[in-house]
Amino acid sequence: MDEFDFNAAPPEFQEIRWMVASIFLISGTGWIVNYVTTIRTALRDRTSGVTLLSLCNNLAWETVFAVIHRPPHLIAALVITVWLLVNIYVIYVSVKFARESQDVSPLLRRHLPVVTLLGFVGFLTGHIALSMHLGPTKALYWGGMICQVTLSASALGLLIQRGHTRGASPAMWLSRFIASSFGVPGLFVRAVYWPSAWGWADNILMRWLSGVFFLLDLSYGAIYYHISRSEHEVGASGSKMSKRE
């Protein structure tokens, strides 16, 4: 992972090195806040607003780059390790409440921990294979973008399918959106100011994935607002009817 040896970067990158570090720190902190908020919201509503599919994918990616291909950059290694540790509890809470839900079939409820473990192992082998094929640094960012789009798409689909905001919250969406809104452009900044090491990141597929993320997460915010407002209107109407009775 020579790309993380910022001391070897050209002078133009050194001038904005503080910006790159700040962007990564903001993005990393935002995702930690998102995970913690996800846990709190799930405990409050006794349901998770994130799919186990996307959480297993995230955990597999975090395991590969916190344990197997640990970045030599201190902040990056520390942030990914914290993500891994917190995400383990996110998955625990999600599995716990999914097994209590009547929307899940009895067969799946009984075997959900095993299914979750198999999903994690499946994604883990995929991220390891991607690292062997592309190299650790490229796999870290390509895999990370795939995780991002998968999480955003599945969260949006879950919100639309349920038609209610239980298990979700504005803080969950906003922390995720802010974290990735800093992290994604940060990769392109590296490509512009250090093209010999990071030029591979500036391509049409990475731009497409970035655009899809923004489209999905902005749509999530708009739909969440619409559903939340409808819930408040129904609640207000119910209160008025109760008073009349």
From Swiss-Prot:
It is found in: Membrane. The chain crosses the membrane at residues 19-39, 48-68, 75-95, 112-132, 140-160, 177-197, 208-228. The keyword Transmembrane applies. It is a multi-pass membrane protein. Shearone derivatives produced by this cluster are interesting candidates for Alzheimer's disease (AD) therapy since they moderately inhibit aggregation of amyloid beta 42 (Abeta42). Keywords: Lyase, Membrane, Transmembrane, Transmembrane helix. It is an enzyme of class 4 (lyase). Its EC number is 4.2.3.-. One of its GO terms (cellular component) is membrane. It holds the Pfam family Pyr4-TMTC. Pathway: Secondary metabolite biosynthesis; terpenoid biosynthesis. One of its GO terms (molecular function) is lyase activity. Terpene cyclase; part of the cluster that mediates the biosynthesis of shearones, diterpenoid pyrones (DPs) which are structurally diverse meroterpenoids consisting of a diterpene linked by a pyrone, and which may exhibit a range of bioactivities. Within the pathway, esdpB takes part to the biosynthesis of the molecular scaffold by catalyzing the cyclization of the prenyl group initiated by protonation and ring-opening of the epoxide to produce the diterpenoid pyrone scaffold. Belongs to the paxB family. PANTHER family: INTEGRAL MEMBRANE PROTEIN (AFU_ORTHOLOGUE AFUA_5G14600), PTHR42038. This is Terpene cyclase esdpB. The lineage of its organism: Eukaryota, Fungi, Dikarya, Ascomycota, Pezizomycotina.
